């Protein structure tokens, strides 16, 4: 969910929880408003605010029983509250993102319990040879790191370098879409939270050239990762199944086909075109050829 006033965040949570249909939501990611204004991307600046646990705890309660995941800019978790640690102890999880934090601040956030980096490299402090920033720490630590593999947010060579860097830590490379409501729609002019943008050939930008989000879907992200990194399907699939499930703390019941786990299965053709979807053992979608 994007940065918004608290009442709108509540409405979005309630809508998500009531509109699952055939889909199954593992949790809700509150990407704003606890981010850095300088690294806000297309989040509305006037709604950005400091993280206070009293407010965050109410959001966690509203999201329950789903898992609550928050993006936090850790340089703003220095008000004596220890918000990151409190979120983790309350059963939520934290990703580091939309941040200008230096490496030491990121290191402290990870020690406090942050588990991941939100859309790594995008809207975060850059890697430099004497100050690795959040981008460098995403590669140098065992935390999970999310990547938007659409060829727009990140160059293919950047994706390949990041994938190889994360290999030594196991399955910590997480494929995400960061898709916005215009994903899957024709090219044209759209609006998101009052921000006008144009979608053209898969790229969604404001008139100033700021990327609003992606038009990516997971099958395309998997195919792109295979191409960018020259890896087989079975390895790319781990980045869209096992890794995100482990990041969300639900790999004991989701993220792989195994005895005792949920019977959630997507059946695809050779180009990952979705043919059938099974949720909890029930067929909820079958393509009509």
Locate predicted features.
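Divalent-metal coordination cores built from histidine and acidic residues
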Residues: 1-66
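Short, electropositive alpha-helical surface patch
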Residues: 8-22, 81-93, 232-237, 253
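Generic structural signal for well-ordered alpha-helices
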Residues: 10-17, 56-57, 84, 106, ...
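Conserved, mostly hydrophobic/aromatic
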Residues: 30, 87, 117, 225, ...
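Active-site gating loops and adjacent loop-to-helix segments of metal-dependent hydrolytic enzymes
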Residues: 37-64, 108-120, 131-144, 186-216
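Active-site core of metal-dependent hydrolases
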Residues: 61-185
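His/Asp/Glu-enriched, well-ordered alpha-helical/loop segment
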Residues: 136-147, 164-177, 182-267
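C-terminal regulatory/interaction regions
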Residues: 253, 262-276, 280-288
